[in-house]
Design a protein with these regions (language model features):
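Acidic Ca2+-chelating loop motifs
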Residues: 19-29, 42-54
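Short loop/turn motifs at secondary-structure junctions and domain boundaries
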Residues: 7-8, 31, 70-71
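Primarily EF-hand calcium-binding motifs
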Residues: 8-19, 34-44
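Hydrophobic h-region of N-terminal signal peptides that target proteins for export
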Residues: 1-4
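Solvent-exposed coil/turn segments that connect beta secondary-structure elements
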Residues: 29, 34, 53, 112-114
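Alpha/beta-hydrolase superfamily serine-hydrolase fold, recognizing
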Residues: 16, 40-41, 59-250
Length: 250
């Protein structure tokens, strides 16, 4: 939903309506939106009209419940790392109140997946909890702009701005900026891999945030099934047409 909210519903509809017949078929929808097709097609005629599309986007929504944190963890939520008011450019920070050492702790930074077109930082809490619960690590989970709002390289610019922000605030929050691991799955895996190999690439650094004096190098990368070779990704058997103009990779 956050991916779509940055655009006017009519603009989204027009972009998805590839044959310009004023209706959306399942094949015209992005992969992540197809699961909602039957919910949007209220008259069950096998296509989505502009009125149905707008009504669905304007429907009342229940706020998502945040996973509860274990006792002994201090959470700092929705911290802006890019000096903007965009919720997609925020991170959550998790600090153990009882630490296993007096020295600054290493930090694990989680980057969510979702095909670069959906996903949210809150999905990282369950994965990070065992580490900061034990008092051995500080944890962070970041949002980044999705492809429906900004195209590449905005995503890596955001991730690097988040890393710089964390380094600039390491002393304040008591973690070791030189022992920073990044962990992600799928699209998040791609982004952490990019962080690992592009620490010295100025073209991918971006100019976001107030911590331009910091670099975006990391000391450890944990890439869970992140795509790496986009030119050949469509050559392997798959239910997804990776070379389609509507694919996340495109």
């Amino acid at each position: 939903a956050s991916c779509l909210s940055a655009k006017d519903p009519k603009q989204i509809f027009s972009e998805w309506d590839k044959d310009k017949n004023g209706l959306l078929s399942p094949k015209e929808l992005p992969r992540n939106a197809r699961t909602n097709f039957e919910r949007v097609d209220t008259n069950r005629d096998g296509s989505i009209s502009l009125a149905e599309h707008e009504a669905f986007l304007k429907r009342p929504r229940q706020p998502r419940k945040r996973r509860p944190l274990p006792e002994g963890i201090k959470s700092l939520l929705n911290l802006s790392y890019a000096n903007t008011d965009n919720p997609r450019q925020t991170l959550d920070l998790f600090l153990p109140e009882k630490r296993r050492q007096d020295a600054p702790l290493p930090i694990i930074v989680y980057i969510h997946g979702g095909g670069w077109e959906n996903g949210r930082k809150e999905s990282g809490i369950g994965k990070l909890t065992p580490y900061f619960k034990a008092g051995s690590f500080v944890g962070a989970s970041i949002n980044y702009r999705l492809s429906g709002e900004s195209i590449w390289p905005a995503q890596i610019h955001d991730c690097k701005a988040a890393i710089r922000w964390l380094k600039g605030n390491a002393e304040k929050y008591g973690f070791d900026a030189e022992r920073m691991a990044v962990w992600g799955n799928s699209a998040g895996g791609h982004l952490v891999a990019m962080l690992g190999v592009s620490g010295g690439v100025k073209a991918l650094e971006g100019k976001l945030g107030k911590h331009s004096d910091q670099d975006s190098r990391v000391s450890c990368v944990v890439d869970f099934c992140g795509p790496t070779h986009f030119l050949s990704i469509g050559k392997f058997p798959s239910n997804i047409d990776h070379d389609s103009p509507n694919s996340p990779e495109s």
